[in-house]
Amino acid sequence: TFFAIIISLIIALGAAQTIGPRWLVFSMRMLLNIIRTIPSIIWAVIAVAAMGANALAGVAALTLYSTGYLGKFFSEAFESVDMKVARSLRGIGADSLQSFQYGIWPHAKPLIWSHCIWMLEYNIRSASIIGYVGAGGLGLQLHAYQEFHQWDRFATVLFCILIVVTVLDFLSEHIRRRIARRDGSNDALSD
């Protein structure tokens, strides 16, 4: 998820209509569409074929899949920001980086972090599935426990996954509530 976040932020800057030039927006959106079209399990099969049956193949598969979705989410978060502040900063002499840093990023950041947590939750669940095709991680462990009928260990791993996903779900909900409160207070101030 970490690698996907970094790659997605870079791609999203080019994919956001309010930030990138038109030719780059089209190219980046097309790239994100292609990546998102392929399910994570297929990315896992491709990665296992290219890298062998190991955890690195699982990381590569989830990174590619997550990049497609996070890139789209991030570019939409950037586009949802009211550009008045960024334009005002440019008007008083700020460069593009400063305009982004102070005019766009602070407003998009809460939504972006919420998407990051959601993707982390998704990837933890997906790791269980893609491991079944040899991409390492929790799924490979679950598959081994199933093969040897070690149902107590199988259940323990599933229970741990459930706990982690539940904690991440609560954390994501907390962030979404903070976003809603912040947006509500900003609306009240602008009236």
PLM region spans:
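Glycine-rich helix-loop "coupling/hinge" segments at transmembrane-helix boundaries
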Residues: 49, 126-161, 180-187
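Hydrophobic alpha-helical segments of integral membrane proteins
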Residues: 23-38, 70, 77, 104, ...
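Transmembrane alpha-helices
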Residues: 96-130, 152-164, 168, 172-174
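Alpha-helical membrane-protein architecture signal
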Residues: 23-27, 56, 67, 97-105, ...
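Generic hydrophobic transmembrane alpha-helix motif, especially the helices
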Residues: 32-63
